[in-house]
């Protein structure tokens, strides 16, 4: 089993070391607001991580109107916040609502194609990556560490999510059998990834821990 270490968070921050290799350490973090100092990076640097996975809300640049100047500006400021050593690591990223472009946003957000392109450009996603030619930012990445195959999966719980019911302070269950969080294509993709017989360890980023899954038929 991985050894898990919790550090002072952005909002949620996890470190763990995979026991198959004493040299492999992957950092996780989310909810990183570019408007404020980020002293947490000093503590992270002391951990000598090899890779970093951004779990969402990697910037705060909500643009419900579709004017993306605010979002682009947020990314530019975030880039200046990142320490130099972080730029030398491999980074994986998935978004949540504040880098998606709309607070609590889901499939109804009209500008999601545009904000997805901005997301892809910021994280230097290659032109031949499937995410450049499909809807949603979900991904998988395989690693071989001391003959163990490890699969990292990031799920997009914004792009396809059915509308929330009720008010922000009084959400209501969604009993519509046609409602979804991932949508059929992402579910099928996920099933295929999880059925990989050669993978011994899965690391999955999914929906926020405080969202009540029973509010959806998934």
Predicted features, each with a name:
Residues 15-17:
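N-terminal signal peptide c-region/cleavage motif recognized by signal peptidases
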């Amino acid at each position: 089993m991985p050894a898990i270490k919790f550090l002072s968070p952005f909002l949620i921050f996890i470190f763990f070391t995979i026991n198959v290799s004493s040299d492999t350490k992957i950092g996780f973090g989310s909810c990183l607001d570019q408007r404020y100092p980020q002293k947490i990076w000093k503590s992270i640097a002391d951990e000598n991580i090899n890779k970093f996975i951004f779990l969402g809300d990697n910037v705060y640049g909500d643009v419900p109107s579709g004017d993306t100047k605010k979002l682009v500006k947020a990314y530019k400021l975030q880039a200046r916040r990142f320490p130099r050593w972080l730029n030398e690591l491999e980074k994986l990223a998935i978004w949540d609502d504040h880098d998606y472009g709309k607070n609590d946003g889901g499939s109804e957000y009209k500008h999601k194609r545009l904000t997805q392109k901005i997301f892809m450009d910021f994280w230097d996603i290659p032109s031949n990556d499937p995410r450049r030619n499909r809807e949603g930012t979900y991904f998988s990445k395989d690693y071989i560490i001391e003959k163990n195959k490890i699969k990292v999966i990031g799920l997009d719980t914004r792009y396809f999510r059915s509308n929330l019911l009720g008010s922000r302070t009084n959400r209501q269950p969604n009993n519509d059998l046609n409602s979804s969080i991932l949508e059929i294509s992402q579910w099928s993709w996920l099933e295929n990834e999880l059925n990989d017989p050669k993978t011994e360890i899965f690391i999955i980023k999914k929906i926020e821990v405080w969202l009540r899954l029973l509010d959806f038929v998934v």
